[in-house]
Amino acid sequence: SARTKGLIPVHLYGQAANMDPLMELAQKHHLRVIEDTAQAFGSDYHGKKLGTIGHVGCFSFYPTKILGAYGDGGLIITDDDQIAEVARTLRAHGAKRNYYNEMVGYNSRLDAIQAAILSVKLPYIDQWIAGRREAARNYNRLLKDMPGVIIPYEAPYTKHVYNQYTIRVLNGKRDQLWRQLHEAGIGTMIYYPIPVHKLPVYERTAPSLEVSERYAGEALSLPIWPQMEMETQRLVVEKISEIVNG
């Protein structure tokens, strides 16, 4: 609409959104593109690193992310000097120099301890991504023929880094599977139980989005980490089969 100022593609679970059509749309309507790369550090789109395609790339260093700090942290990258200046000002209470606030800002500075931890972990990131991708391939082999389960799809234009390995559980059995896996000591997560348009803050924007609502009732993220052993994955999949097809 005439009120639209920008687009925010989300590289969900570790896989790139299809950026070319979005960038073409943005160029046509003079919009800014802000990439949400929180779950996809190290992934790419047609060989170009995510976060470097749009006007701004946003990264999360929360401990559960591909590259995680010990606490909260994040990064914004851009090649636009004006955006960079505003971002630097916003992160420091809206001030370019001490005690001289020019806009309403935040305390969003990355502290030295988090930066040090990230600096130590960064050299291992390619190795850890390779480990996640191998674990995902193992899950794919173990789950691909299981009735009632749809495994993740890796788009041909990207390298999925599997911040989450998220399956779809059909026939209304997702919540039962989540509950019984939890009872068996297998940690899984539901990302995300409520679609954005159903949250109170946005519920007036769209009365119904059927695909989003269906997927929200089917998505289940299985345990995955770079050093995950095949035997552990077999145990997870055996329990899933027992519950879904029992």
Residue spans of the language-model regions?
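Active-site phosphate-binding strand-loop segment of PLP-dependent enzymes
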Residues: 1-69, 75-77, 225
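Acidic, glycine-centered active-site loop in nucleotide-sugar glycosyltransferases
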Residues: 53-54, 72, 165, 181
